[in-house]
Swiss-Prot record:
It is a multi-pass membrane protein. The gene is TMEM184B. PANTHER family: ORGANIC SOLUTE TRANSPORTER-RELATED. Keywords: Membrane, Phosphoprotein, Transmembrane, Transmembrane helix. This is Transmembrane protein 184B. It comes from Bos taurus (Bovine). The modification Phosphoserine is found at residues 388, 402-403.
Length: 407
């Protein structure tokens, strides 16, 4: 039996007893109270709704990835596209698992770590895809080199007044995205370590908590990466116009940046007391973890709409058309497993990091060139200039640039 502090109605027949008796109430143990009622995140309805959106998004995106691998006619572009598309399964499934286990801080942190690490790769791969669309660094520089940077407070280029586009500008864009690929995994590992030592709790901005410092470093890093991505788009938006970059850019930036601002908004609501903690005989969850649980639920729903938008933004149909030549014959394709293996190989990311952080970068840059090959039937929409002749073989040549051309 549990004793609660609610008043018990006095017995009219026993005034003396009523006056002497304390104001208590006896409630059978296990009876529900206001604090023990499960919040929406703990209900079967929340798990079912989020699960429906997640598994639908998985089916849509996995089919799209399969079709890209099946029509793997332009590996240099589709490698980046498939990596970008994987953000939906990873974000959706990880968020769903985090939601299912959000009352357990250990599981919750691990699932969120995997999701956050892949976020960094998506920004880098989208920038690399834009490079590939335009034919490589040298082709981009031949178009924009020496042009003055338009100063605009709206577009965040007011601090670049008087500067011109140079090879240093491209280097900054790549380095700013690559640093996020390093910082984000380091912050994820730090989160796991701090969690193990009891020094990390979601939403705890105390100076003795690791959450404050991880959040500051992460926010600076992701803001720099997204700023560099925007600067590159601002400089090459006219060159990218044949490839419908607006929807692609919007989707990649919204998936990553929207989740970031959602987390910030939920953290503010938590500090304002709008998100209560869960405390019952069975489980006790802090306000920060509850806020993160709500964000996981929102992401589960959002990934369904992201899957639909990404299916349109990165269509496989243009690559399917490139499989067929003028005589209607299909060009031989790699197996799906070998195409997936090539896509998931991080060798190009490592080489690009070495190339962009090398002291010799200001003297050399690489340009993809093609040897003439048979022309296949199909539109050029979504394909890079350097790949307008499908079936050609990629070669790398080095182009010497002036060493004093800095951004």
């Amino acid at each position: 039996m549990t004793v609660r502090g609610a008043a018990l109605a006095p017995d009219p027949a026993s005034p003396t007893t009523a006056a002497a008796s304390p104001s208590i109430s006896v409630i059978p143990e296990g009876s529900p109270t206001a604090m023990e009622q499960p919040v929406f995140l703990m209900t079967t309805a929340a798990q079912a709704i989020s699960g429906f959106f997640v598994w639908t998004a998985l089916l849509i995106t996995c089919h799209q990835i399969y079709m890209h691998l099946r029509c793997y006619s332009c590996p240099n572009e589709q490698r980046y596209i498939v990596r970008i598309l994987f953000i939906v399964p990873i974000y959706a499934f990880d968020s769903w698992l985090s939601l299912l286990f959000f009352t357990n801080d250990q599981y919750y942190v691990y699932f969120g770590t995997v999701r956050d690490c892949y976020e960094a790769l998506v920004i880098y791969n989208f920038l690399s895809l834009c490079y590939e669309y335009l034919g490589g660094e040298s082709s981009i520089m031949s178009e924009i080199r020496g042009k003055p940077i338009e100063s605009s407070c709206m577009y965040g280029t007011c601090c670049l007044w008087g500067k011109t586009y140079s090879i240093g500008f491209l280097r900054f864009c790549k380095q700013a995205t690559l640093q996020f690929c390093v910082v984000k995994p380091l912050m994820a590992v730090s989160t796991v370590v701090l969690q193990a030592f009891g020094k990390y709790r979601d939403g705890d901005f105390d100076v003795t908590s690791g959450y404050l410092y991880v959040t500051i470093i992460y926010n600076i890093s992701v803001s720099l990466a997204l700023y560099a991505l925007f600067l590159f788009y601002f400089a090459t938006r006219e060159l990218l116009s044949p490839y419908s970059p607006v929807l692609k850019f919007f989707m990649v930036k919204s998936v990553i940046f929207l989740s970031f601002w959602q987390g910030m908004l939920l953290a503010i609501l938590e500090k304002c007391g709008a998100i209560p903690k869960i405390h019952s005989a069975r489980v006790s969850v802090g306000e920060g973890t509850v806020a993160a649980g709500y964000q996981d639920f929102i992401i589960c729903v959002e990934m369904f709409f992201a899957a639909l938008a990404l299916r349109h933004a990165f269509t496989y149909k243009v690559y399917a058309d490139k499989r067929v030549d003028a005589q209607g014959r299909c060009a031989p394709m790699k197996s799906i497993s070998s195409s997936l293996k090539e896509t998931m190989n991080p060798h190009d990311i490592v080489q690009d990091a070495i190339h962009n952080f090398s002291p010799a970068y200001q003297q050399y840059t690489q340009q993809s060139t093609l040897e003439p090959g048979p022309t296949w039937r199909g539109g050029a929409h979504g394909l890079s200039r350097s790949h307008s002749l499908s079936g050609a073989r990629d070669n790398e040549k080095t182009l010497l640039l002036s060493s004093d051309d800095e951004f």
